[in-house]
Amino acid sequence: MSIRDEIKKRRTFAIISHPDAGKTTITEQLLYFGGEIREAGTVKGKKTGNFAKSDWMDIEKQRGISVTSSVMQFDYAGKRVNILDTPGHEDFSEDTYRTLMAVDAAVMVVDSAKGIEAQTKKLFEVVKHRGIPVFTFMNKLDRDGREPLDLLEELEEVLGIASYPMNWPIGMGKAFEGLYDLYNERLELYKGNERFAKIEDGDTLFANNPFYEQAKEDIELLTEAGNEFSEEAILAGELTPVFFGSALTNFGVQTFLDTFLKFAPEPHGHKTVDGDEIDPLNKDFSGFVFKIQANMDPRHRDRIAFVRIVSGEFERGMSVNLTRTGKGAKLSNVTQFMAESRENVENAVAGDIIGVYDTGTYQVGDTLTVGKNKFEFEPLPTFTPELFMKVSAKNVMKQKSFHKGIEQLVQEGAIQLYTNYQTGEYMLGAVGQLQFEVFKHRMENEYNAEVVMTPMGKKTVRWIQPEDLDERMSSSRNILAKDRFDQPVFLFENDFALRWFADKYPDVTLEEKM
């Protein structure tokens, strides 16, 4: 098979959801269909020690949340599928955002009893900003939930995207009978030995069943007043196909996967800082680092740089240019992933995610190219942290471990580091409290460095240009610091202090990140 054909086989997507909507369970079912796991375990297995395959970090196993982003790959129906599992917890939107820069589509999992929740909305905004297709899976039909028409209406009103139901539930909870599959023009049966039936047999199968009659009425209403199906609108991120089902009972998941792969896009091009777009079918290899993860294998204390291949083909041992430094690097120790297991990879193509063994060479956002190509991809977004803590080593004798741990976790993008301009004290910035807890846990367990953390509360952060810096600008209402790139930054105690500063120094430009 040619490289061109290999690239066209790739389907790379992320699963986004609010915590507990069933993201881990549906991921397991997809891996099951891809033949990667023998049985699709559920999160309930945590009591027995059979942890969900996509949750590998110790703290994830304890809490049942996805803190990091796993990458899982499998072959199915002639396609090579790459799933990026994103952290669903509200405190990890920064890492999630970067992960969403590396995919070509998103699958949004919604709890049908709860509808669109806060984190789903935040993550959807990120996806909408990129303009990539979104496919919706309304989960947990095996339990009583909200009316399907209400769910569609809320999805459209809250998220501002048109929807098109690919199938429709016949009852739910204990009365759940199956799905009326509009797209495939068939019935999918929840009970009995037969999985599918013809639509014309529905009146016989569900004679005198009020839920079937209700489903037919709803579908008639949607046919008359609903949105039209449009593949073009789906690919433009303007219309989301909606699938109903139950990941826990593995009902409707394979139908979703089959249909999703028909419409999910091939690998996208990616823009450079100069505004050019690099075509995936370009023969020259290029890619960017969207994540760095330390200690994926605690026995080896290693670091992996996750690279999204944008164009061409990776071959083991190839030499690449690192645009940021202007230096070359050899890609010899490279892996691909199946949750916590990984394998050395000989070659991979545009759309694939590879893990490059990193000794400190790479940073999040780095561009890799070959030959005389020296372009740079658009920078990945940075979140402005809201919460801050002072941090220091508890044991002076452990300074080396302390500094190594901080350096690696900061490069990984797990937390942001600021240094007080006057005192040299370290300050950590995060978008949520849980990031601090994970940082402390990992420093102690992975680097054997206990830390003392002192809350500083919420701060309003603004960057300034180095040429505008004057240390006399620092006052009791702000802290002058520098970020890990040595850029000057002010931490204001509140919005009032920010406005006071802006009035006093009108010529100083204050910059905010996302």
Swiss-Prot record:
Its main localization is cytoplasm
Query: In which compartments does the protein localize?
Result: Cytoplasm
UniProt entry tagged with the keyword GTP-binding: yes
Instruction: Write down a Pfam family by its short name.
Output: EF-G_D2
**Domain tr-type G: start-end pairs:** 8-268
Among InterPro entries, the record links this protein to: EF-G-like_DII, EFG_III/V, G_TR_CS, P-loop_NTPase, PrfC, RF3_C, RF3_dom_3_sf, RF3_GTP-bd
Record has Signal as a keyword: no
Task: Provide the GO MF annotations for this entry.
Answer: GTP binding; GTPase activity; translation release factor activity, codon nonspecific; translation release factor activity, codon specific
What UniProt keywords apply to this chain's record, in alphabetical order? Cytoplasm, GTP-binding, Nucleotide-binding, Protein biosynthesis
> Which positions does UniProt annotate for GTP binding?
17-24, 85-89, 139-142
Offer one example of a GO biological process linked to this entry: regulation of translational termination
Q: Name one GO cellular component term.
A: cytosol
- State the similarity comment: Belongs to the TRAFAC class translation factor GTPase superfamily. Classic translation factor GTPase family. PrfC subfamily.
Task performed by this protein: Increases the formation of ribosomal termination complexes and stimulates activities of RF-1 and RF-2. It binds guanine nucleotides and has strong preference for UGA stop codons. It may interact directly with the ribosome. The stimulation of RF-1 and RF-2 is significantly reduced by GTP and GDP, but not by GMP.
Q: What is this protein called?
A: Peptide chain release factor 3
What's the encoding gene here? prfC
